[in-house]
């Protein structure tokens, strides 16, 4: 007979832990990002990602499964109408956890958990194009070096002196601006 895992629970009891995660998930889908303790954020991540996966399917049965957890119908509508279709091309990794400064008072490690808003679509065609480009790059590099050497050989002494004068003028301007910048910092 399977036995439940031993150990500490968030909130003390199983029902309280379930309520905590339901409330955290509701806030996450409502606001897009929330600040909570690091351990709660790490525990919330798989919980929230499973709900997003249900929303991606979009069936009535999946909606009812999500409604068992998230009681706010407006948030469920947002989840199924906006968030689920947004991640239709993405297989997992819908959330990110960013560690922040510890909380004042009890010094608990805090984190921000947020929904990832960037689209990352890497199809096989993109991957093949990158592989081909990386294979062609070593062959093209020697040709570019020859062009650079030819251009350097064609440069006349007058052009070199002109370039040196421009570089010196720029250095003089930056040297003149440096004391003014230091005075501005002191003020």
From Swiss-Prot:
Ribonucleoprotein in keyword set: yes
PROSITE patterns: RIBOSOMAL_L17 (PS01167)
GO biological process: translation
Highest taxon in the source lineage: Bacteria
InterPro entries: Ribosomal_bL17, Ribosomal_bL17_CS, Ribosomal_bL17_sf
Keywords: Ribonucleoprotein, Ribosomal protein
Gene Ontology cellular component list: cytosolic large ribosomal subunit
Residues in the signal sequence: none
UniProt-recorded Gene Ontology molecular function terms: structural constituent of ribosome
Coiled-coil zones: none
HAMAP family: Ribosomal_bL17
Family that this chain belongs to: Belongs to the bacterial ribosomal protein bL17 family.
Subunit structure: Part of the 50S ribosomal subunit. Contacts protein L32.
Descriptive protein name: Large ribosomal subunit protein bL17
Organism of provenance: Rhodococcus opacus (strain B4)
Gene giving rise to this polypeptide: rplQ
């Amino acid at each position: 007979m399977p036995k439940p895992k031993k150990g500490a629970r968030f909130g003390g009891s199983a029902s309280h832990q379930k309520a905590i995660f339901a409330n955290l998930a509701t806030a996450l889908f409502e606001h897009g990002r929330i600040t909570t303790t690091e351990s709660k954020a790490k525990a919330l991540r798989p919980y929230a990602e499973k709900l997003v996966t249900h929303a991606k399917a979009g069936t009535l049965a999946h909606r009812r499964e999500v409604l068992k957890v998230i009681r706010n119908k407006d948030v469920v509508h947002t989840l199924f109408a906006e968030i689920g279709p947004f991640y239709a091309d993405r297989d997992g990794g819908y959330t990110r956890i960013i560690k922040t400064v510890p909380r004042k008072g009890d010094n608990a490690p805090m984190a921000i958990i947020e929904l990832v808003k960037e689209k990352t679509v890497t199809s096989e065609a993109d991957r093949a194009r990158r592989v081909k480009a990386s294979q062609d790059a070593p062959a093209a590099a020697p040709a570019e070096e020859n062009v650079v050497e030819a251009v350097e050989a064609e440069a006349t002494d007058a052009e070199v002196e002109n370039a040196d004068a421009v570089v010196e003028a720029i250095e003089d301007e930056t040297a003149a601006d440096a004391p003014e910048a230091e005075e501005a910092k002191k003020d």
